[in-house]
Amino acid sequence: METGLRTGELIGLTWDSVNFEKRTITINKTLEYRHKQGCWRAGPPKTPSSYRTIPLTNRAYEILQSVYATKDTRKQSPALNQVLEFMDRRTGEKSSLIMKDLVFINWRTGEPAKNSSYDTHLYKLCDEATIKRFCMHALRHTYATRAIEKGMQPKVLQKLLGHNSLQTTMDRYVHVTDDSLRKGVQQFERNNQDQNGVKLVSGQ
């Protein structure tokens, strides 16, 4: 909700990609757990446009500072001893992900939280709140929709989400909510009241 990251981008975030001074994070790799193979797989972001640097909100900055302050006391499993190689999508050169440098791990197991674990936790929260279940990717859609509702420029949102095209951002990720419909009508009504009369507009 604070960054609009894809789940794999969040899981694969490492400390060398966090700049506390500039208050940014850089997205240049992903990480996912392959259940059939029983192993972790590092990879590049989805497209060349997915390589990006994102300014942090105050809330995101505070969370990262809190995690960083306790990173040396967290449990570490043997899985964190791995260094995973992958191909950089932009250069075609080999790159690597050092597992022990991951920002987010499971404090109980000392391993990176699997993709499915995030969804499972969300499902539990939804059940407790007695609302319809949704997955992690739905939060990315929510981020996009709320950003536009709060006045963010579409091209800026496209850059933050790492999309190739603005059409993808606006048609697939930004949704018209009941609240935005209501506000749109209220804005129309206010603007209409500011006018002395109504000028008819034909289709000619």
Describe the role of every protein-language-model region:
Residues T3, I54, K71-E93, M99-K159, ...:
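Short, basic (Lys/Arg/His-rich) helix/loop patches that form interaction surfaces
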Residues N28, T57, I105-W107, V174:
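Residue-level detector of conserved, well-ordered beta-strand and adjacent loop positions
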Residues M1-L31, K155:
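Short, charged phosphate-coordinating catalytic segments
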Residues K22, H35, C39-Y51, N58-A60, ...:
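C-terminal secondary-structure termini that scaffold catalytic or DNA-interacting sites
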Residues G12, F20, D171, H175, ...:
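Phosphate-coordinating loops and pocket residues in cytosolic domains that bind phosphorylated ligands
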Residues L31, T142, L161-Q187:
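Catalytic-site neighborhood detector that most strongly recognizes the C-terminal catalytic loop/helix
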